[in-house]
Amino acid sequence: MSQMPIELKGSSFTLSVVHLHDSQPEVIYQALQEKIEQAPAFLKNAPVVINVAALTAETDWIKLQQAISSTGLHVVGVSGCTDDALKKIIAQAGLPLLSEGKAQRRVVEPVAAVPAAVKTQIIDTPVRSGQQIYARNCDLIVTSNVSAGAEVIADGNIHIYGMMRGRALAGVSGDVQSQIFCTHLAAELVSIAGRYWLSDQVPEAYFGQPARINLNQLDNVLTIKPLD
């Protein structure tokens, strides 16, 4: 049998979500330009999802979309839209409306749980610019340096025993309890479960220092402290 011309498979990707808190195109354009200049390797020409939860139907979406696209970012979808009129405008612009699915409740009989071994992926070589390491369904340990322009990603925790100059994204499948441990922090970006800091948002006192980053469960923001 000849091979089918196409094949559909499920997959997952790490995308930045831009939350809009202003509807003025020129304000959004300037704010995005500043962010791109701070982390060009991460944001230049990047695909993004736009969250419009704070906007209303009075928003001139066409001009707003043009302002975002003119920065070089590629809008691949829109999330957080609850206004029916705004939904229609966005759909007419040819963009998909994204929403977080809610799992259906189901009743299962209790069974004796067998503790699963915690998996860990270990990288013993330097992670160079342009490389991406993804530890799916496990923690990631890097025993060497991570260069600027490199990306280390994990569904669990990330441990970096070297100079961290690239991007570290922990808990990418939504694990808000994931953490980042680093012996020499100089990252372009750190992220836990979608919440992230660019390099200029990391407290200066921790630059080049051993640090531990986690997500505060009370207010859902990143926090940092010395790595003892």
Swiss-Prot record:
Interacts with MinD and FtsZ. This is Probable septum site-determining protein MinC. Transmembrane segments: none annotated. It comes from the Bacteria. The gene is minC. Cell division inhibitor that blocks the formation of polar Z ring septums. Rapidly oscillates between the poles of the cell to destabilize FtsZ filaments that have formed before they mature into polar Z rings. Prevents FtsZ polymerization. NCBIfam families: minC (TIGR01222). Belongs to the MinC family. One of its GO terms (biological process) is regulation of cell septum assembly. Keywords: Cell cycle, Cell division, Septation. The keyword Cell cycle applies.
